[in-house]
Amino acid sequence: MVEYKPNQTVYAYHGPLIYEAKILKLKNGKDSFIINQDFQHEPLEEKPNSSGNHHHHHHSQHIAKFDPKKWQDQTCYYLHYQGWNSKWDEWVGIDRIMEYNEENKFKKLELDQLTKKKKAINNNEIIVNATTKNHTNNKNKKESNKRKSSSATTTSGVTAGTNNNKKQKSASTSTTNNTSGNSGTTSNKSKQILSRLNLNFPPELKHILVNDWEYITKDRKLVSLPSQYPINQILQDYKTYRTKQLTSNSDQLSILIEILTGLEIYFNKSLSLILLYKYEHLQYLNFLKQNIINPQQDILQSNIYGVEHLLRLIISFPGLLSTTTMDGISLSVLISELESLCRFIGDRLQLYQNNYEFTSPQYDSLARS
């Protein structure tokens, strides 16, 4: 356990992001005093009009009052966020601060990236599929839900005006890039293909997603994670099952492997950007914080999340693929493989489904703020 002292620089969580901060004061566990920047002891409760307010007097109106009841028997730290106005200085518990080192710097940068990308993605309206809109704006939830349950076929709404979105493109094309027989398709032709881009999504899986939406947004529950059958396991099971069917065809086999590898990479990259409901963001951040997910150590999102989150990605694919440059042949190979994967999952729902659990009051108030 690291011991923190006044004047030390640390990383601190404030809302969903991590900032650089300096410890101005601290109170250790059961101590009956506060240690300030000069390593002097201060009383826990300020006496009214105390003359001992020395050099902090000029912003005394900003000083966050120390709350003895709240911090009883707990170690806590009075932080100043670097570059912020001192009115944001606050007392925080040990769970909010982290050592100032490379690994935590990586976490900080990843969260900064997520927030930027989230804004970029919202602006670009890449997500055009009704179901995915569900995850990004709350207005259409009820409406798209009705739509979701009424038809068993998801059709992309081809409205994304971002054909030049490289990242999005490369993620979705990489899955079948070298299977493209003819990548010089004219954009007109591809528009026709896209208007017919249908994914037959079995009604029983749609039902899972409707319930999933209800549990999280209405009942404020979370999928119980890490999943017993995480996504990489499901894809592995499916690969084994499909390999038996394709034994004689090495070309099809290599396409299958490419699609499944691409799907897993795509999931890991897109989870925090487009596949989580707002209420789940904090759960994801906690996984990062506790190293339950740590891409640097090869502990990936697909090792933790399960079938519900995989289905959210699959049902979004027509919308995501509407910005791709894949030709019609590759697209139809990809779509039919995804449909086959859906049927496979449908037959094994009892095995793969996860439970939902209520969150703690702390989680609930933080996640909704």
From Swiss-Prot:
Residue stretches of biased makeup (Low complexity): 126-135, 150-191
Protein name from the UniProt record: Chromatin modification-related protein EAF3
Species of provenance: Candida albicans (strain SC5314 / ATCC MYA-2876) (Yeast)
Superkingdom, taxonomy of origin: Eukaryota
Keyword line: Chromatin regulator, DNA damage, DNA repair, Nucleus, Transcription, Transcription regulation
Family statement drawn from the similarity comment of this UniProt entry: Belongs to the MRG family.
Residue intervals of the MRG domain: 193-368
Assembly and binders: Component of the NuA4 histone acetyltransferase complex.
Subcellular location: Nucleus
Chief location of this protein within or outside the cell: nucleus
